[in-house]
Design a protein with these regions (language model features):
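N-terminal Rossmann-like dinucleotide/flavin-binding domain of flavoprotein oxidoreductases
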Residues: 1-32, 111-135
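Glycine/serine-rich phosphate-binding loop and adjoining beta1-alpha1 elements at the start
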Residues: 7-11, 17-20, 29-59
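Flavin (primarily FAD) cofactor-binding/catalytic cores of flavoenzymes
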Residues: 14, 134-138, 170, 191
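Short hydrophobic core segments
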Residues: 14, 32-43, 78-79, 99, ...
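Conserved beta-strand-loop-beta-strand element in the redox core of flavoprotein oxidoreductases
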Residues: 18-32, 141-151, 157
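Glycine/Thr-rich phosphate-binding loops of Rossmann-like dinucleotide-binding domains
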Residues: 48-50, 87, 92, 166-169
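FAD-site-proximal beta/loop scaffold in flavoenzymes
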Residues: 56-72, 152-203
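Rossmann-like dinucleotide-binding cores of NAD(P)H-dependent redox enzymes
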Residues: 67-68, 73-77, 83-142
């Protein structure tokens, strides 16, 4: 439906070739396209922390793998006590899965009002959820998680430490202002580059 006189859809992997204040050049395959403005909507990817034993470990899940699973794990360790991590922790706990949350910060949900967090933390722990704060993961050995406060084991380990903007193909825009893994925009979705805009999970 997008293919009409106002919009042309081109399937393929695109990359930015060059940018000036007057135009942006994009390459898709062997063809280049030029426009006055660029809107970046490349989304984001799960961030995989450089923790020894995480990469290529079949026990490790990200949020996409957790949602795609057809079976409940026997037990779950969730690395990261942010919003997404605690959403999964609550979900699995309600489904009867023993859950341990490991958060490196002094508290879970660090971006929320701390009075609310205190109430939630008490509720989670009273319900039987194990929540470890101020605890850093140092290594993963199969199903075992080694931390600064001991070792923990579960059938699966869900790594939920945030997402990062998908910047593949945007290397030519090295001057883009970034913050916490996303492109910085104003209320009009403008970046710090005159003719470059961004929207969605990439911000």
């Amino acid at each position: 439906k997008l293919n009409n006189e106002h919009c042309t859809v081109i399937m393929g992997a695109a990359s930015v070739v060059s940018r000036t204040d007057e135009n942006v050049v994009i390459a898709c395959g062997d063809v280049q396209y030029e426009a006055e403005n660029l809107l970046i909507c490349t989304g984001s990817n799960n961030f995989v922390p450089p923790i020894p034993g995480v990469k290529d470990n079949p026990a490790i899940w990200d949020s996409t793998m957790a949602l795609d699973s057809k079976e409940l794990p026997q037990s779950m360790i969730i690395v990261g006590g942010g919003v997404i991590g605690m959403e999964f922790a609550t979900l699995y706990h309600e489904l009867g899965v023993p859950v341990t949350v490991i958060e490196a910060m002094p508290t879970i949900l660090p971006n929320l009002d701390q009075e609310v967090v205190t109430i939630l933390l008490e509720k989670y722990r009273k319900a039987g959820m194990q929540i470890l704060t101020d605890t850093k993961v140092t290594e993963v050995q199969g199903n075992k998680v080694l931390t600064t406060n001991g070792e923990y084991e579960a059938e699966h380990i869900l790594v939920s430490v945030g997402r990062r903007a998908n910047m593949q193909g945007l290397e030519a825009l090295s001057d883009l202002e970034m913050y916490r893994g996303g492109i910085v925009v104003d209320e009009m979705m403008r970046t710090n580059l005159k003719n470059v805009y961004a929207a969605g999970d990439v911000t």
